[in-house]
C-alpha cells in the first residue's frame, strides 16, 4: 500500500534551534525507517524525474546519498556522490556553497560526469537553495546538463526556489 503525502509529512521530525538558534532541522530518519514512506518518497520522486530522462542522479552528502541512490536504482541510472572534502578520492572538482546553516565545499570525483550527460540533482531538503545551486553549477562546469532538481522537503519560508528560478525544481512536501 502506498503512503500518502500526509503520512510522509507526519514522519518528518522538526528539531528546533539546530544548527543554530532560530533555525530548525528537518530530520527524515523516521520517514526513511518506514518502508512504505521510504518507498513512496522514492516512487514519487521517480515519477516526476522519469520524464526528464536522466542518465545520472547526483546526491550530496549526507541526505542526498540515501534517497539519491534509491532514486538512481528505480530510474536505472548511475549515481554520483557530491562529497565533503578530505575523503580519499581520485582527482576532484570542487564547488563551494553557503547558506543559513554554514558554508563549505562539495567535491565531485573527476570523470564521473561525462560531457553532455543528463544529470538529475537530488537532496533531501531545499532551504536557501545554496547547496543545490552549487551542485548544479558544478555539474555544468564539468560538461553535464542539469535536467532537474528534486527534493523531499522544501522549507518555503527560506525561499530557496528564488535562487533556483532558472531551474526545473520539484519537491514532494512543502513546509
Predicted regions and their residues:
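PRPP-associated nucleotide enzymes
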Residues: 1-175
Amino acid at each position: 500500500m502506498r503512503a500518502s503525502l500526509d503520512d510522509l509529512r507526519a514522519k518528518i521530525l522538526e528539531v528546533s534551534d539546530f544548527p543554530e538558534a532560530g533555525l530548525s532541522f528537518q530530520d527524515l530518519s523516521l520517514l526513511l525507517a518506514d518502508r512504505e514512506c521510504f518507498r513512496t518518497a522514492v516512487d514519487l520522486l521517480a515519477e516526476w524525474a522519469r520524464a526528464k530522462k536522466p542518465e545520472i542522479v547526483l546526491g550530496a552528502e549526507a541526505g542526498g546519498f540515501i534517497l539519491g541512490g534509491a532514486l538512481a536504482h528505480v530510474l536505472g541510472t548511475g549515481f554520483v556522490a557530491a562529497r565533503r572534502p578530505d575523503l580519499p578520492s581520485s582527482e576532484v572538482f570542487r564547488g563551494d556553497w553557503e547558506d543559513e546553516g554554514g558554508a563549505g565545499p562539495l567535491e565531485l570525483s573527476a570523470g564521473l560526469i561525462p560531457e553532455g550527460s543528463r544529470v538529475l540533482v537530488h537532496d533531501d531538503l531545499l532551504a536557501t537553495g545554496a547547496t543545490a545551486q552549487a551542485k548544479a553549477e558544478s555539474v555544468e562546469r564539468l560538461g553535464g546538463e542539469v535536467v532537474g532538481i528534486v527534493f523531499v522537503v522544501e522549507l518555503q519560508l527560506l525561499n530557496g526556489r528564488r535562487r533556483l528560478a532558472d531551474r526545473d525544481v520539484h519537491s514532494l512536501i512543502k513546509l
